């Protein structure tokens, strides 16, 4: 019961921070991997909970793929990518259990948005702090979304991850490729949708307009 209340509070908190009206936003439940059609049904501000599989990825993983030209050993088509370097406990060769799995800052990885969608068919990215405007057009063009999650909620996120099913490139620990099985992961807020809408951009524009109004009143 408390988990459900906590999830809803986190989503409403995020919508309040970005100035969106929760009464006009849809609540959705999705399973990943998924396809472009389902992604394009989402709109900025929607609340989404996720079942299925998500892929943990971070800076060094993507540098290996795109800068060094090494193909990833996991299928990323239709994938949900989580920006993370999780805290785990090793149980044996290739076997790990979760300790703490939170998110890391997404903005420094924005340059990978275009090739993730174009070359690998990635459908969703989730992390902390959002993505800048340069991610909006690649996400619109390739049918992708960015899911926002409230920072500092790693304990709840870890609980929603049922199992670490697979790990690749262990030499990059903890920035390996991770495959997590999740249940009711979220709520996540669609912060950038596949139609060119971004809650982050909207907030920046609101702040700019208010600043202009303040200066005009001096």
Please provide the spans of the model-predicted regions.
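Short, structured beta-strand/loop micro-motifs enriched in basic residues and often containing a Trp
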Residues: 26-34
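Feature captures the catalytic cores and cofactor-binding loops of soluble hydro-lyases/lyases
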Residues: 56-185
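Short, surface-exposed secondary-structure edge patches
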Residues: 36-41
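C-terminal binding/interaction regions
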Residues: 163-218
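Short, charged beta-turn/beta-strand-edge "cap" motif at the junction between a beta-strand
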Residues: 47, 53-57, 194
């Amino acid at each position: 019961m408390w988990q459900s209340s906590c999830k809803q509070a986190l989503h409403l908190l995020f919508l309040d921070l970005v100035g969106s009206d929760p009464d006009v936003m849809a609540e959705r439940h999705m399973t990943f991997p998924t396809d472009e059609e389902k992604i394009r049904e989402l709109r900025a501000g929607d609340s989404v909970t996720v079942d299925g599989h998500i892929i943990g990825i971070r800076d060094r993983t993507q540098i290996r793929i795109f800068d060094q030209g090494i193909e990833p050993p996991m299928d990323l088509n239709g994938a949900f990518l989580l920006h993370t370097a999780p805290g785990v406990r090793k149980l044996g060769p290739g076997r790990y259990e979760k300790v703490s799995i939170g998110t890391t800052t997404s903005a420094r990885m924005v340059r990978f948005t275009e090739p993730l969608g174009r070359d690998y068919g990635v459908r969703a990215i989730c992390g902390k702090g959002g993505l800048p405007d340069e991610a909006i057009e690649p996400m619109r063009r390739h049918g992708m979304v960015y899911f926002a999650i409230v920072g500092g909620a790693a304990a709840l996120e870890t609980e929603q991850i049922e199992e670490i099913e697979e790990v690749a490139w262990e030499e990059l620990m903890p920035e390996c490729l991770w495959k997590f099985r999740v249940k009711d992961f979220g709520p996540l807020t669609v912060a950038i949708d596949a139609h060119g809408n971004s809650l982050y951009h909207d907030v920046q524009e609101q702040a700019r307009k208010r600043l202009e109004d303040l200066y005009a009143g001096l």
